[in-house]
Structure formats: structure tokens, C-alpha cells
Design a protein with these regions (language model features):
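Acidic/histidine-rich helix-loop elements
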Residues: 31-40, 106-111, 203-210, 215-220, ...
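Active-site neighborhood of phospho(di)ester-bond hydrolases with catalytic His/Asp-centered motifs
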Residues: 270-274, 294-300, 326-334, 370, ...
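Extended active-site neighborhood of metal-dependent phosphoesterases/phosphodiesterases
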Residues: 236-249, 253-256, 312-405, 438, ...
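Active-site environment of divalent metal-dependent phosphoester hydrolases
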Residues: 277-280, 303-306, 332-341, 375-379, ...
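Acidic, histidine-bearing metal-coordination/catalytic regions of metal-dependent phosphoesterases
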Residues: 3-270, 538-570
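An acidic-aromatic substrate-binding cleft motif
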Residues: 247-298, 303
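Loop/turn elements at helix/coil->beta-strand transitions in domains of secreted/extracellular proteins
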Residues: 265-268, 290-295, 323-329, 362-367, ...
């Protein structure tokens, strides 16, 4: 009986050692957060920055020594010792998860199982090399030829890049300038194109179809799709592409009806920000809104863009709320910068080339999208000297100056601006003071009717003329009895924040536990020149809101006079 118990102890200790290493390695998106939690960035020792790497190496050393020493000595006390060590490290992993990594578990679990798959492959090789020769199975022809056959098939399929092509992420129609960018993805490397009214528009690179990509982004004229009100995406897998010929797979297609922006009954739009993978809650909120002309997604739909699937998550959310039937406007968030695919994100969403600032035009709507990039200044420790946004910010200031000189916005009845990081709100760290001040000054000249923003994971309503600019803020006493050392810029336009998880204004759920994502619905009356703003939660309820930094309660509906920018509420 004792031998059985010690054998169980040995196995459990080794399994825990494997789990600790694989799980902590999968937590890579949270490593900088660990350093931050324990104080790095506040004049603490540099070793704190490298502590997560040191811990990961320590987990590896424990695992290897567990495997080697148990093999050499096979002592019961050794098994118990390693079980205790592995259990203590398991507690460390659980504490890290509890302190914040739990909000990233939807990233971490896929990475964990990916590592587990690699481990399974290594163990299979170990079995073939060290265990199989000692078994009676080596004399079994059926087993030997079965293994050989499976390995041969796997190698052939790998070499041929075998897959059955299909559309994995449905088409989303992004609005950029006077064009729509239709984006969809496939599980195989393939060519893609869009058919509208019998005319094909191709995903090309300098005249040649892109054949070795899984994400397909095709530009079409707005007027063409608005008139046709339907489009079909096509894809063909690239089986073989040689210098003098090739073979393409069968044509796979999907047809979607499209509803262009119709302002005959005014303008209605729905916006979300800081979804952070809560796509089901976002879809639920949108389901309660009967009609909207377009969608605005103001960034941070995910927390880290590390993989191809992460980059496609933007289109997953966009499709859930638009069904590919209405246009989507996208603004990049600070989390959308992070990860391996952050540099490739412009291929997956609406963007002007590789830039995330641009204008867009609908019937009676002039729109601007701005992008501050990261949420801290360039010298912030988390960016490890990889952030250099000064020129990018200046380019956007020049862009706004050019727009003012052209005055093209005067041809449109409604002026909408979008930026993930709030432009009129300067936080207590005083980040981006120059660019926010300059952007505010320029937007003040453009008769902006609404600036949508996110980032803070709160509902903040910035009403022009209500709070003295450039002065320390005091919280609404109904919300919090405290002051805030940030301030507001000197702005003359309404700005609404749309980044709140939860059901109510004061809810503060962890992202991983959020049962609701609050969105903002705006109904613009072009006859009376007003806009009515309503926050909705995932139960379809109107959210009762207040001004966070002023003693003012707005209720569930806010109506703004677009001429005077005066707010009335009920």
C-alpha cells in the first residue's frame, strides 16, 4: 500500500511541476503586470522587472531536477520533497491568477493547451525512442505499420499544407474615407475577392492576387455597395502556385445583404469600447437595439493581439453586432498595439494603409478617427524603449489642420469624431498633454457634434462649459467623496465615454466576471438638430448616469442641442 501511495506522490509532484511551468509560461501576457504589481516602475530594483523570467526559469529547473533526480535515486523522501515544492509553486501560480491574470485566462488557456500539445509530441518521441523498443509491441506488425502509416500521412499532409478551405470569420464592412473595406478570413492560405452587382473587386498586391494569406481585405467604392445593397465574398485555396502555372481549389462564397446609412429618419448609431473579449455580452446589448445605421468600435476589443486568432477577434465582435449588414467604424485602442499581431492589425480592420487615423463619410455624416496609440508617454517603463509616438501624433495634428483648411466637413450636417484614449481628459499622470491640448484646439474649430472615447472602463460624460478647464477635478459626491488630480482640456463639444462593463453606472466587475457590456446608442434628429444619447446594458435596460466630476444627474436620456451644445436630461 505504501508503495502505491509513494507512486501517486511521485506522479502528482511531476504533473504539478509540468503544470506550473506550462501555465506560468502561458501567462506571458501578464508578466509585465506581475512586475508592476510588485512595485517595478516606482524606483524599485531592476531585478523586479526580470522577476517573471527568473520565476519561469526556476519552474523549469524544478521540473528538470524532478525528472532527473527521481530517475537516478527513486527515494520516497525525494518524491515528498518535490511534491511540496511543486505544490508551493502551484500556490504561487494561483495567487498570480487571483491578483489579475484571471482577466486574461481566455488568452492564457489557449497558450497553455498549445504548449501541452508540444509536450505531448515530445512525450510521443520519448515513447518511440526509449519505451517502445522494450515492449512486446515491437514484434506486432499491425502496430508497427500502423505507427509508420500514421506518421507518413502526417508528414505528407504537413508538407502539402493540407486543409479544407472555409470562411472562418465572416465578412465585416469597415468605413474608411469614401470606401468600404470588406474583411474576412479563411482557415487556408487562399485568394479572396468580393462580387458586387456582377463586378469583382480583388485582394491584390501591386496587381497580383494575394494567394498566400488567410485574411482578406478588399476595398470597394461606397457608392457601389450602397446602390447594390448586397455583396458576395469569394475564396479559393491556393493548392499549388508555381512559376508557370498553378492549381486553385473550389470557389467558396457567402452572400450578405447590406443596409447603407439612410438619414431620411435621422441618424442612429451604436458604439462600444473596451470589450476585452466580452463579445457575448456586447452582442446581447446590441440585440436590444432595433435599428442602427452603423457601428462604432472604439478600441480595446481584446487585451493582447498575440496570435492570428486574436487579430481576428476584432472581426468576430464586429460581425456579431453588425452581421456584415451595416458599416463599422474602428478606432485603435492602446491594447490593440500590444502583441505580435499588433503590427499586423491594419490588415484585419479598417485602416488607411497602416495608419489608424482617417476620415469617413456617410450620407450627412462627416467622421474623424484619431489614434493616440499607447496610453502613457513614450518613456513609460512598460514599453521598454519601443514607443516613439511623437511623429505619429504630430502627423495627426497636421491632418486636422489640413481638414480645417479644406472645410469639407461644412458639407455634412453631423460631425462625429472617435478616439480610444479620451482627448479632453488628462489623467493624473499627465500623459499626452501636448497632443491632447492641440487636438482639442483643432477639434474646437470643426463644430464637432460628438467625440466618442473609451479606455477608462467607466462612463464619463464631458459636457462643454460645465467644468473649469485645466483645474483639478472633484468627484460627484453621489459617486465618490474625493478629488482627482487630472483635469479637462478647454473643449466646446460633447464627448461621451463608452467603456463600461457591468449593468449600472457604479458597477465595477472584474473583466472576467462581467455579465454585461454597456453600449451607447445615439439618435440624431436632423430636423430639430438634436441628438439623444442613451446607455444600454446587456439586459436591454437604460442606464441611469451622472457626471462623474460635477454635481449633475443626467438620468437615462440626454438630449443635446447641436447648435448650442446645451444638454437636457430626463
Amino acid at each position: 500500500m505504501k508503495n502505491v501511495i509513494y507512486k501517486i506522490i511521485r506522479i502528482v509532484g511531476t504533473v504539478l511541476a509540468f503544470f506550473n511551468l506550462l501555465m506560468f509560461y502561458a501567462m506571458r501576457p501578464c508578466w509585465s503586470g506581475i512586475s508592476k504589481t510588485i512595485g517595478y516602475g516606482t524606483n524599485k530594483p531592476t531585478i523586479l522587472y526580470y522577476l517573471p523570467i527568473i520565476i519561469c526559469v526556476l519552474f523549469l529547473v524544478v521540473l528538470l531536477s524532478d525528472l532527473i533526480l527521481k530517475k537516478i535515486f527513486n527515494k520516497n523522501w525525494l518524491h515528498i520533497t518535490y511534491l511540496v515544492i511543486s505544490f508551493l509553486f502551484f500556490v504561487v501560480v494561483m495567487v498570480v491568477i487571483k491578483l489579475g491574470a484571471i482577466d486574461y485566462m481566455r488568452f492564457i488557456w489557449p497558450k497553455f493547451f498549445e504548449s501541452l500539445a508540444y509536450l505531448a509530441g515530445i512525450l510521443f518521441l520519448y515513447f518511440l525512442i526509449f519505451i517502445y523498443p522494450k515492449l512486446g509491441l515491437k514484434e506486432n506488425k499491425f502496430f508497427k505499420y500502423g505507427i509508420l502509416g500514421l506518421c507518413s500521412i502526417a508528414v505528407v499532409l504537413f508538407l502539402l499544407h493540407f486543409s479544407i478551405n472555409r470562411i472562418t470569420y465572416n465578412p465585416v464592412v469597415y468605413a474608411v474615407e469614401d470606401k468600404y473595406q470588406i474583411v474576412f478570413s479563411t482557415n487556408s492560405e487562399a485568394k479572396g475577392w468580393v462580387e458586387i452587382g456582377g463586378v469583382n473587386y480583388y485582394d491584390t498586391y501591386n496587381g497580383s492576387d494575394k494567394k498566400f494569406t488567410k485574411v482578406h481585405k478588399i476595398e470597394v467604392p461606397m457608392a457601389t455597395l450602397d446602390t447594390s445593397k448586397s455583396y458576395t465574398v469569394h475564396t479559393q485555396r491556393s493548392i499549388y502556385c508555381g512559376p508557370f502555372g498553378g492549381f486553385m481549389g473550389r470557389d467558396i462564397s457567402k452572400t450578405t445583404s447590406f443596409r447603407p446609412v439612410d438619414t431620411s429618419d435621422g441618424i442612429q448609431y451604436l458604439s462600444f469600447s473596451d470589450v476585452h473579449m466580452n463579445d457575448r455580452q456586447t452582442e446581447k446589448t446590441a440585440s436590444f437595439i432595433e435599428k442602427y445605421d452603423f457601428i462604432v468600435l472604439a478600441g480595446d476589443l481584446i487585451s493582447d493581439v498575440e496570435t492570428f486568432e486574436d487579430a481576428n477577434f476584432f472581426n468576430k465582435v464586429a460581425y456579431k453586432v453588425s452581421k456584415g449588414e451595416v458599416p463599422v467604424v474602428y478606432a485603435r485602442g492602446n491594447h490593440d498595439v500590444k502583441g505580435r499581431y499588433g503590427e499586423e492589425l491594419h490588415k484585419f480592420v479598417g485602416a488607411k494603409g497602416d495608419q489608424f487615423y482617417y476620415n469617413f463619410y456617410f450620407n450627412d455624416v462627416y467622421g474623424l478617427v484619431l489614434d493616440l496609440g499607447e496610453d502613457h508617454d513614450d518613456d513609460w517603463w512598460e514599453y521598454y524603449d519601443t514607443a516613439h509616438y511623437a511623429d505619429y501624433h504630430e502627423a495627426q495634428i497636421s491632418f486636422l489642420e489640413e481638414e480645417i483648411n479644406k472645410k469639407n466637413y461644412d458639407n455634412y450636417k453631423y460631425h462625429l469624431a472617435v478616439a480610444h484614449v479620451p482627448i479632453v481628459f488628462v489623467n493624473y499622470r499627465k500623459n499626452h498633454v501636448h497632443v491632447k491640448t492641440e487636438m482639442t484646439r483643432l477639434l474646437n474649430q470643426m463644430d464637432i457634434d460628438m467625440l466618442l472615447c473609451g479606455h477608462q472602463h467607466d462612463i464619463m460624460i464631458f459636457e462643454p462649459g460645465l467644468i473649469e478647464p485645466n483645474t483639478k477635478l472633484t468627484y460627484n459626491s453621489a459617486y465618490k467623496d474625493d478629488t482627482y488630480s487630472g483635469y479637462l482640456t478647454d473643449f466646446n463639444f460633447p464627448s461621451f465615454m463608452i467603456s463600461k462593463p457591468g449593468y449600472t453606472f457604479s458597477d465595477e466587475p472584474a473583466l472576467s466576471k462581467a455579465k454585461s457590456q454597456i453600449g451607447l446608442y445615439v439618435d440624431v434628429d436632423l430636423v430639430n438638430n438634436t441628438e439623444t444619447c442613451i446607455y444600454y446594458n446587456s439586459r436591454g435596460e437604460k442606464v441611469d448616469v451622472m457626471n462623474m466630476y460635477y454635481e449633475k444627474h443626467y438620468g437615462t436620456e440626454i438630449t443635446i442641442d447641436l447648435n448650442t451644445k446645451v444638454f437636457t436630461s430626463r
